[in-house]
């Protein structure tokens, strides 16, 4: 009621005055209330999160998260991490920093047990011909997911697996995952279509620590910086001498 009867008419009056001042043909600016939220975090232009209580005039029984430009709603983030980032944001909105520390620690343990298919980055693969190199598999400056795709295709040929696994083609939807340095292929990444071929024998070389950092902690970093929180307890002099 306050928005409809007080705030919106005042804003419309100001817009009319602005249109008149700037000699506009007509005032085309219209403001309507979108949400009422009790908490919000803005980290950059068009990147924010709100704890919504009222959505376009509908009072919600339980608060709802509204996310804009956040990794939790981006398809380039693994699904399991998107869900957990949303959980973490709910903790940030309604609980204490120690509760976030527990969520991160618990998810880290779970993450380390997940298969490659659950924690890999989804991407679209383009420009395979552009970055292919007959002598070195790929050229310098190749995007990491394309690099992984070219390594995958090379190994499929080398191991004679063409009849079992399709080669990655231009425009295919793929996943890529980081590998530890000491792996049989000698490259730090591998891409694949739906399942990482067991014949590659790379499961023990998946770099879970890097994947956790890149898929979960890094997307959370700008949110935590905005509220001055950390993702794990920090050692302090007070605690050391206490």
Show the residue positions of the predicted features.
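DNA-dependent DNA polymerase catalytic subunits
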Residues: 1-242
